[in-house]
């Protein structure tokens, strides 16, 4: 089954740039850009993917400071982006929607940050021709609304110059920070101007905010861990898929066991859902591994894995032609198995 899943042309719809660098890539990045190959750095990398039993969302977010330091220069950000694309390509991901929060520091402005990432995506096409990469700039709800408005303005600016690359906006960050309603103006502008919306919703048990988010609407829901049965029904009626990230939810402490993960209820009710990694580096996983967990936990068949992949194709922000090409790749893969 692992070989089948590994070779399957998969679709990744929920991947954060800075969280998707695995330990090998972190060491490659440190060595190439910063010349750091010390034993101390190796220990830092090991600690980066190590989770205690009492881990929670706050402890997970603390880990990102380590990677943000490595991507705080133009060269670091550029190489990190290339490494993430490389790692997903090596896992036979045929389509990747990468999300990242534009950052500003002494080395670059937020516009520069997005330009570096976009330019790297373009350059990577020749090196990794079998993976199609799109970008979703992220609003960090921990930051001021003015920063969110700048992020949306930049996303719209680059969506005009690179419409095949910038396809949506993500709202993420520490879920206990900021008020969702404060960001609705910026999100609504993005939606009115044609960008798709992905909202990290119900990561924590906050019923009033969950209701606000569902009322506001979204193209896809990130996590949905604390959605009620009524919320699930509302999502299904609106055909809003929930991005299920099993390892992430377990290691962050938001779900107590794989068996209790809400993906089970979504599959039983045939509600829209997609399997994703979230932060494959931080959580030391891959999309192949996530599918294997789904297979082993819920007794999912090969055909169901194919169906889950085709569902991800359907809910991607790719163009209609790109979705057809992705579905064709999956079909060719299935046909190749039948002729073996």
UniProtKB/Swiss-Prot annotation:
Keyword Aminoacyl-tRNA synthetase: no
Gene3D superfamilies the record matches: Metal-dependent hydrolases
Signal sequence, start to end: none
Gene Ontology biological process terms from the UniProt entry: adenosine catabolic process; inosine biosynthetic process; nucleotide metabolic process
Presence of keyword Zinc: yes
Binding positions for N(6)-methyl-AMP per the UniProt entry: 16, 18, 68, 100-103, 173, 203, 278-279
Site (Important for catalytic activity): 223
Molecular function per GO: adenosine deaminase activity; metal ion binding; N6-methyl-AMP deaminase activity
Enzyme class: hydrolase
InterPro entries associated with the record: A_deaminase_dom, Ado/ade_deaminase, Metal_Hydrolase
Protein keywords: Hydrolase, Metal-binding, Nucleotide metabolism, Zinc
Cofactor note: Binds 1 zinc ion per subunit.
Reactions catalysed according to its record: N(6)-methyl-AMP + H2O + H(+) = IMP + methylamine
Domain of life (superkingdom): Eukaryota
Positions with a binding annotation for Zn(2+): 14, 16, 200, 278
Active site (record annotation): 203 (proton donor)
This enzyme's EC code(s): 3.5.4.-
Cofactor list: Zn(2+)
Annotated family: Belongs to the metallo-dependent hydrolases superfamily. Adenosine and AMP deaminases family.
Subunit structure: Monomer.
Function: Catalyzes the hydrolysis of the free cytosolic methylated adenosine nucleotide N(6)-methyl-AMP (N6-mAMP) to produce inositol monophosphate (IMP) and methylamine. Is required for the catabolism of cytosolic N6-mAMP, which is derived from the degradation of mRNA containing N6-methylated adenine (m6A).
Protein name: Adenosine deaminase-like protein
Lineage: Eukaryota, Metazoa, Ecdysozoa, Arthropoda, Hexapoda
């Amino acid at each position: 089954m692992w070989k089948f899943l590994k070779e399957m042309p998969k679709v990744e719809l929920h991947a954060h740039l800075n969280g998707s660098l695995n330990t090998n890539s972190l060491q490659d990045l440190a060595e190439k850009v910063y010349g750091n190959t010390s034993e101390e750095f190796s220990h830092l990398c090991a600690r980066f993917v190590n989770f205690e039993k009492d881990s929670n969302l706050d402890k997970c977010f603390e880990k990102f400071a380590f990677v943000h330091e490595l991507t705080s220069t133009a060269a670091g950000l550029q190489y990190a982006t290339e490494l993430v694309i490389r790692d997903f390509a090596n896992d036979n991901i045929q389509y990747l929607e990468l999300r990242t929060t534009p950052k500003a520091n002494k080395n670059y402005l937020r516009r520069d940050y997005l330009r570096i990432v976009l330019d790297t995506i373009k350059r990577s096409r020749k090196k990794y021709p079998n993976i199609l990469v799109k970008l979703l700039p992220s609003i960090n709800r921990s930051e001021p609304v003015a920063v969110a408005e700048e992020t949306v303005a930049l996303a719209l600016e680059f969506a005009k110059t690179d419409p095949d690359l910038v396809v949506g906006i993500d709202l993420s960050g520490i879920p206990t920070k900021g008020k969702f309603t404060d960001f609705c103006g910026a999100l609504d502008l993005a939606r009115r101007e044609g960008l798709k919306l992905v909202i990290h919703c119900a990561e924590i048990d906050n019923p009033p905010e969950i209701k606000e988010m569902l009322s506001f609407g979204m193209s896809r829901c990130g996590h949905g861990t604390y959605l009620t049965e009524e919320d699930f029904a509302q999502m299904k009626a609106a055909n809003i898929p929930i991005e299920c990230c099993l390892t992430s939810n377990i290691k962050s402490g938001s779900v107590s066991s794989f068996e209790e993960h809400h993906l089970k209820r979504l599959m039983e009710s045939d509600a829209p859902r997609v399997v994703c990694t979230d932060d494959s580096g931080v959580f030391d996983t891959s999309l192949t591994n996530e599918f294997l967990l789904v297979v082993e936990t819920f007794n999912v068949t090969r055909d169901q894995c194919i169906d889950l992949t085709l569902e991800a194709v359907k809910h991607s922000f790719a163009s209609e032609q790109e979705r057809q090409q992705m579905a064709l790749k999956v079909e060719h893969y299935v046909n190749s198995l039948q002729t073996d």
